[in-house]
Curated annotation (Swiss-Prot):
GO terms for biological process: translation. It comes from Acidithiobacillus ferrooxidans (strain ATCC 23270 / DSM 14882 / CIP 104768 / NCIMB 8455) (Ferrobacillus ferrooxidans (strain ATCC 23270)). InterPro entries: Ribosomal_bS20, Ribosomal_bS20_sf. The gene is rpsT. SUPFAM superfamilies: Ribosomal protein S20 (SSF46992). The keyword RNA-binding applies. PANTHER family: 30S RIBOSOMAL PROTEIN S20, SMALL RIBOSOMAL SUBUNIT PROTEIN BS20C. GO terms for cellular component: cytosol; small ribosomal subunit. The keyword RNA-binding applies. This is Small ribosomal subunit protein bS20.
Length: 91
């Protein structure tokens, strides 16, 4: 238990940050799932627009220090590969 005023304040700040970061991580996962869902359905145009939105959210999450940049690069690469494979399969 925090004994000093400073320690109590830090506990409150950390909890506030934890909740905010959890919200950002959840948003990130939601956008990634949106791309995967569009790919699964086979809607190429929807997948492309979802990919653009997801990449933006991924980059913002990295900029805020919530996600690691390597995870972001890996995720964007895998998502774009799936969307690109959709285009090749359609031709």
């Amino acid at each position: 238990m925090a004994n000093t005023a400073q320690a109590r304040k830090r506990v409150l700040q950390n909890e506030k940050r934890r909740l905010h970061n959890a919200s950002l991580r959840s948003r990130l996962r939601t956008y990634v799932k949106g791309v995967l869902k569009a790919v699964h359905v086979g809607d190429q145009e929807q997948a492309r627009s979802a990919l653009r939105a997801a990449e933006s959210v991924i980059d913002k999450t990295v900029g805020k220090g919530v996600a690691h940049r390597n995870m972001a690069a890996r995720t964007k690469s895998r998502l774009s590969a799936r969307v690109k494979a959709m285009g090749n399969a359609a031709q």
